[in-house]
Amino acid sequence: MSAATTRLRLRVSPGNGRAEIVGRHGDAWKVRVTAPPEQGRANDAVVRLLADTFALPLSAVAIVSGHSARDKIIELTGVGPALIERRLASASSVDRGRKDRRT
């Protein structure tokens, strides 16, 4: 049996103060990375952020389209869509802010 492969839409904001998953942005997820959008550094930072979030090797995260755009399609190998949604929701700063206000 082959590993699950799932595509994910992202809206990337490069050159920020910290790398984080912000929350939903329409049908995509908004992420921020500290790297500038120069020479693929922001793309590399996006791949690292997602690999860390899902505990995947870097080779399991690939940018399928949008290499030079803010809107990207990412392919994740080894994780299904339901788990992706749960992990992104729990990792998002918007969700963390809601949890902080409830306590």
Segments from the language model and where they lie:
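Contiguous, often N-terminal, cationic amphipathic patches that form binding interfaces
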Residues: 1-48, 53-58, 62-103
